[in-house]
UniProtKB/Swiss-Prot annotation:
Location in or out of the cell: Host cytoplasm; Host nucleus; Host mitochondrion
Function: Multifunctional protein that plays a role in silencing host antiviral defenses and promoting viral transcription. Does not seem to be essential for HBV infection. May be directly involved in development of cirrhosis and liver cancer (hepatocellular carcinoma). Most of cytosolic activities involve modulation of cytosolic calcium. The effect on apoptosis is controversial depending on the cell types in which the studies have been conducted. May induce apoptosis by localizing in mitochondria and causing loss of mitochondrial membrane potential.
This protein's GO CC annotations: host cell mitochondrion; host cell nucleus
Taxonomic classification: Viruses, Riboviria, Pararnavirae, Artverviricota, Revtraviricetes
Record note on quaternary structure: May form homodimer. May interact with host CEBPA, CFLAR, CREB1, DDB1, E4F1, HBXIP, HSPD1/HSP60, NFKBIA, POLR2E and SMAD4. Interacts with host SMC5-SMC6 complex and induces its degradation. Interacts with host TRPC4AP; leading to prevent ubiquitination of TRPC4AP. Interacts with host PLSCR1; this interaction promotes ubiquitination and degradation of HBx and impairs HBx-mediated cell proliferation.
GO biological process: DNA-templated transcription; symbiont-mediated activation of host NF-kappaB cascade; symbiont-mediated arrest of host cell cycle during G2/M transition; viral genome replication
HAMAP family membership: HBV_X (MF_04074)
One Pfam family per UniProt: X
Annotated InterPro entries: Transactivation_prot_X
Protein name: Protein X
Mitochondrial targeting sequence: region residues: 68-117
Length: 154
């Protein structure tokens, strides 16, 4: 079973953050609307420990209250800077967390929607997800089962 993470835009830093949703949560957050400030992380989710989630091979920063730095690094590498990211990308990711059907217009939106979120939600374990999330992050992994060669696993 895949752990649930919600994607939120941090307008103060112009970055996208993944935040763990507690096991006791019954659904995806619906209170945030595009253009509004994202809701704070659920208080029932520990900010420093990912052992309650079923994901493995994620960097330790994935469970921080600020969200994983890996996503910020990967976004910066693929889109030059996170500030220059397409304005529709946060909307697309937000729609995906709500289970809506976003109309993506760029290759990076399609990549995230189809290769990352879909495989993550449906199978819970996807090599391309690991490559995307771990790329560029220097934090230690959480419960990593074995070393992985990210250059040959995609």
């Amino acid at each position: 079973m895949a752990a649930r993470l919600c994607c939120q835009l941090d307008p103060a830093r112009d970055v996208l953050c993944l935040r763990p949703v507690g096991a006791e949560s019954c659904g995806r957050p619906l209170s945030w609307s595009p253009g509004a400030l994202p809701p704070p992380s659920p208080p029932s989710v520990p900010a420093d420990d990912g052992s309650h989630l079923s994901l493995r091979g994620l960097p330790a920063c994935a469970f921080s209250s600020a969200g994983p730095c890996a996503l910020r690094f990967t976004s910066a590498r693929r889109m030059e800077t996170t500030v220059n990211a397409p304005q529709s990308l946060p909307t697309t990711l937000h729609k995906r967390t709500l289970g809506l059907s976003p109309r993506s217009t760029t290759w990076i939106e399609e990549y995230i929607k189809d290769c990352v979120f879909k495989d993550w939600e449906e199978s819970g374990e996807e090599l391309r997800l690991k490559v995307f999330v771990l790329g560029g992050c220097r934090h230690k992994l959480v419960c990593s089962p074995a070393p992985c060669n990210f250059f040959t696993s995609a």
